[in-house]
Amino acid sequence: MATTSLAQPAIQSQIDTPTPLRLWHLTSLWHLTSLDAPTVAVTWTLAFAWAAQIHLPLWLPITLALAAWSAYIADRLLDAHRAYLSPTGVADTCSLIPDPCSLSLRPRHHFHWKHRRVFIPLAFAAGLAALSLVLVNMPLAARERNSVLAAAALVYFTSVHNPWRLATPKLSLRLPKELLVALIFTLACAIPTLSRISPRIPARRPELLIPTLAFIALAWLNCQAIETWESATPSRNLIFPLAATLTAVTALIATIFLAGHQALIAALLATAATSAALLALLNRHRHRVTPTTLRAAADLVLLTPLVLLIMPAFTQ
């Protein structure tokens, strides 16, 4: 997910030895091709709509997926470009030993750089397709409303990849990047549903704000876990207690909603609690899998709301 895919690279370069299980081959490829973020984005968007009993137009999740894919590809290519840039200002594509800062890249960055001739046109095509869908299908009022979130995402993205950011540390964003990514990503998934809630809809906007906050916390936990696991100088690992706390609190709130006959909201919260518990489990067993598999699994566990989408909707 959502995820710290927009964060800076920080650990050693290595391409993991493929695991013998085909499932993990596919999962790793899903991550390496940056398809993890758009998959999570679409799943969460449809899950919020499911909980509110709202049918979103097909173009909307497609647009979100294309925009997320384009942004994450661009982020990883820009990270790789900066790391591989030679002192002369030209990417050193022929050298068997890349620029020293490229040694901090992760497998996903190397994969994107190696296949940049494919990813660059794909990113442009996905971005243009998303923009076209917005211009053709989104009402003007909705565009104005969503422009605030789009501007926030653009400001964050440019601040991360601003080549002069190290020279102006006082101008850097003070809010932790993991929280910023979590806020932008989750709100992009929730706003299509929140903006369509009316008095005739069983799930009122305040009620859906609770799971929105829960998923923001889940996205932050995912980003924080990835940052902790991939950091070259990790601080104290607090992922397990944080995940356990989020699991317990979210499960308790889900129980309260269920007791109040809000079964759909409760089910959505239950999937968030399950994802948090799975992140805690991943943290406990993180040393048993390769870094790429661990990184892919961190986003894979965010897909628990898929259970809601494949089961028949039930009424409250």
Where would I find each of the regions flagged by the language model?
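Short, hydrophobic transmembrane alpha-helix segments
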Residues: L46-W59
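Short polybasic linear motifs
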Residues: Q14-T19, P87, C94-L103
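Loop-to-helix transition at the N-terminal end of transmembrane alpha-helices
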Residues: L56-W69
